[in-house]
């Protein structure tokens, strides 16, 4: 058992920070120390912002985005093209595409990708909601912006099959997305090129 080096509140802060993706125990300790040193300028406001987010964050019942309102800001933005829908695996992919600032459209978040080995099937994803949105008749193009992994390809083919009876185009991202790559790690220029070069399936 390792020695404790600080009080339980600080230890808990370090443990929670270590659970954030990209932060291991060492990075969490450094982050905790930085926050503590900047208590008034950073720790207190961060604590308040996290408390407020915990109370107000919602999952959009329409698209699956994370926001403080339901429907979310993107779904209620009347300046966005309601006839084009970009399908992504996760909210982080949606945010990455928004950073590319190439298309002013709406989104649909699946909440993952098909992965039989991990026990993730169609019923575990928000595919039914996607089919219902397309069935409304307002959508003329669905852009599949899933990751270029084996699971992503499987998900894209399954969705294409599910949407095959509707009178609309199904396209997917093309050039710029490397095989095995994940959208959240791509730069804005690459994402913009991929959106412009999408192809019909």
Swiss-Prot record:
Annotated InterPro entries:
DNA_Rcmb_RecR, Rcmb_RecR, Rcmb_RecR_Znf, TOPRIM_dom, TOPRIM_RecR
What keywords does the record list, in alphabetical order?
DNA damage, DNA recombination, DNA repair, Metal-binding, Zinc, Zinc-finger
Record-linked SMART domains: TOPRIM
Positions of the zinc fingers (C4-type)?
Answer: 60-75
**Cystine crosslinks:** none
Q: Name one GO molecular function term.
A: DNA binding
User: Gene3D superfamilies under this entry?
Assistant: 3.40.1360.10, 6.10.250.240, RecR Domain 1
The answer to whether the entry has keyword Cytoplasm is no
Which superkingdom heads the taxonomic lineage of this protein's source? Bacteria
GO terms for biological process, alphabetical: DNA recombination; DNA repair
Pinpoint the Toprim domain residues. 83-178
Q: Which family does it belong to?
A: Belongs to the RecR family.
Supply the PANTHER family for this chain: RECOMBINATION PROTEIN RECR
Summary of the function given for this chain in its UniProt record: May play a role in DNA repair. It seems to be involved in an RecBC-independent recombinational process of DNA repair. It may act with RecF and RecO.
Name the record gives this protein: Recombination protein RecR
**Species the sequence originates in:** Brucella melitensis biotype 2 (strain ATCC 23457)
Its taxonomic placement starts with:
Bacteria, Pseudomonadati, Pseudomonadota, Alphaproteobacteria, Hyphomicrobiales
């Amino acid at each position: 058992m390792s020695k404790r080096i600080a009080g339980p509140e600080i230890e808990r802060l370090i443990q929670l920070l270590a659970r954030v993706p990209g932060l291991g125990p060492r990075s969490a300790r450094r982050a905790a120390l930085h926050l503590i040193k900047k208590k008034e300028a950073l720790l207190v406001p961060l604590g308040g912002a996290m408390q407020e987010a915990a109370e107000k964050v919602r999952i959009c019942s329409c698209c699956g985005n994370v926001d403080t309102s339901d429907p979310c800001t993107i779904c209620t933005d009347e300046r966005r093209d309601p006839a084009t829908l970009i399908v992504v695996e996760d909210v982080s992919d949606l945010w990455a595409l928004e950073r590319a600032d190439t298309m002013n459209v709406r989104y649909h978040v699946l909440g993952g990708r098909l992965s039989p080995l991990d026990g993730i099937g169609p019923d575990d994803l928000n595919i039914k909601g996607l089919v219902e949105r397309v069935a409304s008749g307002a959508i003329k193009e669905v852009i599949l912006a899933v990751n270029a992994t084996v699971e992503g390809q499987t998900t894209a083919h399954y969705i294409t099959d599910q949407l095959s009876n509707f009178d609309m185009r199904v396209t997917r991202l093309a050039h710029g997305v490397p095989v095995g790559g994940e959208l959240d790690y791509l730069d804005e220029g690459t994402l913009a090129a991929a959106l412009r070069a999408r192809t019909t399936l």
